[in-house]
């Protein structure tokens, strides 16, 4: 009976996950002949080109890692007080969490495009600064849009409410008697937080960090809309190789490398 119940999900998993991954892995080795330029001969040339010195794609990967790390750290630091406030300070008003999340149920593209309107040369921010005579009308702040800063700002905005959830759950499950015991033993609020609350909520922090880092390292929609050439990321290169360049072997190499990195991170942080 158990085997019968598992057969459906297993077939689904093999057809729509394992098989596509194996196909992409085979393509990265040149084993599949799909286009006239494909040889169908197994070769590591694509991997050597990607991992070799001076590879623009490898450099782009590390650029994306730096940006994703920055976003993940900032988002985790900003989301922790939100989760702390909701879990330990306002237990009777947890509907605040719903109020925070509801605006983020709107279209992702609309929210990103809203930032584009706000940060443009004639957007809300520049117009306000011009109205306050902080900036001359003909000299807007150009780096507010189409830059690495813009990409990281928008990504942080998008992910903060969702990262607050695992932190909230972690803090909400804390044994309150431990906090009371620390207080009874004379520990200050700061010492109680540093010695009790923070260590016990560490799994939630790690989960929140990974929850942001893994998706953002391969992000391509946000850089495409608000990043320009400065905010171009690894995911954009991967997309361009498959769509514009039609270089599916190189695109498969980039995709498999990202999959290996993500799988490694999941294995590393899985114990949390």
Give each language-model segment a name.
Residues 7-18, 102, 157, 163-176, ...:
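Transmembrane alpha-helices
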Residues 34-40, 220-248:
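Glycine-rich helix-loop "coupling/hinge" segments at transmembrane-helix boundaries
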Residues 55-86:
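Transmembrane alpha-helix signature in integral membrane proteins
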Residues 112-156, 190, 226-230:
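Membrane-interfacial helix termini and adjacent extracytoplasmic/periplasmic loops
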Residues 168-179, 183, 252-272:
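C-terminal transmembrane helix and the adjacent membrane-cytosol boundary/short C-terminal tail
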């Amino acid at each position: 009976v158990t085997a019968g119940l598992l057969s459906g999900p297993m077939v689904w998993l093999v057809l729509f996950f394992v098989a596509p991954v194996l196909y992409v892995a085979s393509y990265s080795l040149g084993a599949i002949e799909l286009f006239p330029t494909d040889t169908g001969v197994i070769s590591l040339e694509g991997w050597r080109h990607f991992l070799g010195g001076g590879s623009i794609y490898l450099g782009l990967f590390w650029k994306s890692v730096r940006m994703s790390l920055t976003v993940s750290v900032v988002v985790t630091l900003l989301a922790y007080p939100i989760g702390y406030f909701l879990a330990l300070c306002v237990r009777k008003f947890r509907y605040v969490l719903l109020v925070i999340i509801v605006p983020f149920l709107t279209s992702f593209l609309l929210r990103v495009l809203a930032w584009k309107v706000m940060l443009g040369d004639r957007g809300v921010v520049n117009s306000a600064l011009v109205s306050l005579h902080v900036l001359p009308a003909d000299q807007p702040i150009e780096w507010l849009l189409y830059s690495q800063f813009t990409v990281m700002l928008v990504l942080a905005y998008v992910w903060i409410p969702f990262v607050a959830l695992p932190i909230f759950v972690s803090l909400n499950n804390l044994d309150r008697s431990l906090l009371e015991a620390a207080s009874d033993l004379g520990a200050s609020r700061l010492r109680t937080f540093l010695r009790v609350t923070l260590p016990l909520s560490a799994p939630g922090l790690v989960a929140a960090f990974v929850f942001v880092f893994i998706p953002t390292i391969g992000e391509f929609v946000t850089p495409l809309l608000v990043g320009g050439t400065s905010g171009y990321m690894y995911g954009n290169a991967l997309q361009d190789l498959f769509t514009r360049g039609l270089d599916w072997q190189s695109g498969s190499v980039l995709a498999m490398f990202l999959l290996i990195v993500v799988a490694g991170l999941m294995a590393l942080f899985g114990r949390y």
